[in-house]
Amino acid sequence: MYILIISCTLLLLGLLLFIIDAFILKSEEIPLIKNTKNRFCILIPARDESNVIENLIMSIESQSININMKDVYVIVEDKNDKTIDICKKHNVNFYIRKKLNLKSKGYALMEIIEYLYESNNIYDTYFIFDADNILDKDYFKEMLVCYENGYDIATGYRKSTNVNKNVISTCSALTFSLINNLLNKNKQSKNRSITISGTGYYISNKIINKFKSFPFHLLTEDYELSIYLSLEKYITFYNTKAIFYDEQPLSFKESIKQRTRWCFGFLQVRKKYFKDILKHLNNKNVLGEFISITPYVLMLLSIILLYIYLILNITLYPIKYIKLIIILSLFIYFILILFTITLLYLDKNLNIKTSNKIKAILYNPIFILSYIYCITKALFSDVSWEKIEHNASKD
C-alpha cells in the first residue's frame, strides 16, 4: 500500500512541476541593444567528414547574401583527412587540431577560437555547424537579423535531410521537433533562455570574449552552454525562419548510442552546475532549468513503482493483476501515441510522408520508452565521445 501512495505522490508532484514550468514561470523581458558590427565566421568541427561536408560548404556558397569563404574554418584531426581536400577545393580554411588527447566537440571549438585570438582574427559572431548540416539559402540572412537586433545567441529551425528514410530517422527527427516546438517556443514566449541543441546556432563575441576561448567541454557542450546562458542572463532567440538540415541515425543501435551520450552529458552538466543552479533559483530562468526534466522523471518513477506494486501482488490474485499490468501498459502506450500525434500536428514543416507518420505514431512510443535504457546505461557506465557515422543519406 505504501508503494501505491508514494507512486501517486510522485505522479502529482510531477504534474505540478510540469504545470509550473510550462505555464507559470515567466522571466522579465531584458531590453535589447542593437549590434552595428556583424563580422562573422563559420566554425565546423569535421573529423573524417569527407562524405558529407561538401554539401554544407556548397549550401554556404549558395546563400542569398554574400559569404566570404575565407571566414569558414573546418576543424580536422589528421593531415591525411580527405576533408582537407574538399576545403582546398572550395577555398575554405582548415585547422588541424593539436590537443588530440582532449576529445569532444567543445575542445575542437576551444582550439580554433584560441587560434583565432592568437592570430588577432577576432569576429563579432561565431556560427557553429556540424559537418552533416545543409543550410537553407536564407539561413544567414535571417540569423543576422537576430544578431543585429541584439540577441547574444540564437538558433535556427532544424529539419532533417533523411526524415522519411525509415521509422528510426522519423522518430529521431521528432525528438528535435519536441525541443523546437514544445520547449523552445514555450521558453521564448515567456522570455526564458532557449535550449541550444548542438548545431545551427551563433554565439556572439560578447560571450566568447570573456574567455577568449570556448569553455564548454562536457560531452553535451550545447546543454552546458544552455545552462551557462540561463545563469548569466544572456538574451537568446529561436528563429523559425532560419532553416537548416541535418542527418538522423538510421539504425536503432546508432540512435541508442547517440541518445545515451545525450543522457550522460545531461547528467554531467547537472552535476557540474548543481551548486550554481541552487544559488540562483530566484532567477526564473534558472528555476526553469532546475525543474527541467524533473516532472518527467517523477512521473516515470511513479509508473515504475506502480508496476512494482502490481508485480508484488500478482501472486495474490494472478488474473486480476496481470489484467491490470496489461491495462496500464496499453494506457501508457496510448498516451504516448497521443503525444506523438500532438508533435506531428504542431510541427507541420517536418515534411513526413503519410505512411511514415502512421509508422511513427505506432513506433515512437517504443522509441521514447527506450530512453529508460539510455538513462540507465548513462547512470551506470562511463560513456565517452563516439563518432556517429554520416553518409549524406537523403530521402
Task: State where each predicted segment sits.
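N-proximal low-complexity "stem/linker" segments adjacent to membrane-targeting elements
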Residues: 1-58
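Juxtamembrane C-terminal module of membrane proteins
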Residues: 22-29, 33-37, 275-288, 316-395
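Cell-envelope/extracellular polymer assembly enzymes that use nucleotide-activated donors
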Residues: 38-41, 71, 224
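Acidic helix N-cap motif at the loop->helix transition within catalytic regions
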Residues: 54, 81-88, 138
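Short, acidic, metal-binding catalytic loop of nucleotide-sugar glycosyltransferases
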Residues: 58-69
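A conserved acidic beta->alpha catalytic loop
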Residues: 76-84, 99-101, 134
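Acidic donor-binding/catalytic loop of UDP-sugar-dependent glycosyltransferases
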Residues: 82, 129-146
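Long helical/loop segments within the catalytic core of UDP-sugar-dependent glycosyltransferases
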Residues: 96-98, 102-116, 139-219, 260-263, ...
